[in-house]
Amino acid sequence: MQTNIRNAPLVLVGAGHAHLVSLRHWVIQGYRARAGSLMINPEPQAWYSGMMPGLIAGRFKPEQCQVPLAGLCAAVGLELVCSKLSELNADSGLLELADGQTIEFETLSLNNGAVAATPFEHDQSLQLLGAKPFPGFIHQWQSWLSSPPRQLAILGGGAAGFELAVALRISFPDTLLDLFSSRTLLSGHPPRLARLARARLKHAQVTLHENQPIDGITDGQLYVQSSAVLQPQAVILATGTAAPAWQRRCGLDCDADGFIRINPQLQSLSHPNIFASGDCASLPDTPHSGVYAVRQGGVLGDNLMAQIKGTALKTYQPQPSALALLACADGSALLSYGSLATEGRLAGKLKDWLDLRFMRQMT
């Protein structure tokens, strides 16, 4: 029988983009959570993903990319608990934390992100480093600064893989860098954006391997179609998102990949007292992207208030297309919107302005 269960009327798990925007929304609205409400996050600060490439390229300092959580939580009546969620039992309304705490909640909001996908077999003969979660990646990157790796393989031909590749070139000018894409580079974006990205990678002396999905890792080597193609010192996973293991066994209605299925009000389809947003959630026409998570934040903030008050919930409507800005490590950026694509310093200035404005709003 469990003892020392802590009761909380509202619990927010994870300081992702949607939760940060929700908290700022509450500050503006003058809303304070009921006594005993909690924010659970592994660290006392949240990393802003949009500025990570700039940090790696030396354009920003770590503190510029972090949102301190204590003051923001205190402003809306939340107690910050620095721990990691280990288990959720949705039916009983219980959370088990890594530090041994058990919390019983009335309303729960999950914005805990995701982990890097590993879509192949490996024998652990190479170090695998996920681009997410950010704290682990940043810690390893900082340790590499004093002893740069001989060769790195970056897996993932999306925006994250591209941005990491060109940023890591600045950090490690003498390291061999290889970027592997299972499809064409930046598939899903306009073809012109991919052409611009290829030119940037060539200029940065990053070797690009398109349409080469990794089959596995054995004896320190990467395999494509059962043939060894590379023997790097480490592998960085920018291969998209995977659900944390606990989501598959928590009792919530999840999709085939373990992401929590939600309705347009951002509620779990199976448990209406549980909300989910950002990378941990599954909603039609809503990619796992910070742009969409930020837009969810205002609706989520209003709906958590409404859930507690018993009033009507608002509906989140994903935008049909989103502006994409890919940092190029030198202050410029690639830009696409719909079928349009361009590049240059002006796009980089726009990205910096948007990122720094977001950080000013959060601090």
Where would I find each of the regions flagged by the language model?
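Short glycine-rich anion-binding loops that position phosphate/pyrophosphate groups of nucleotides
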Residues: 18, 113-116, 241-243, 331
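C-terminal auxiliary extensions adjacent to catalytic cores
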Residues: 330-363
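FAD-binding core/adjacent interface of flavoenzyme oxidoreductases
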Residues: 2-11, 75-151, 236
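A Rossmann-like FAD-binding core segment of flavoenzymes
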Residues: 80-87, 103, 173-264
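A conserved FAD-binding loop/helix module that cradles the flavin
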Residues: 280-329
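Beta1-alpha1 glycine-rich phosphate/pyrophosphate-binding loop at the start
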Residues: 2-78, 152, 163-191
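Hydrophobic/aromatic residues located in beta-strands of well-ordered beta-sheets
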Residues: 37-39, 108, 177, 235, ...
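FAD-site-proximal beta/loop scaffold in flavoenzymes
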Residues: 126-148, 229-234, 238-295, 302
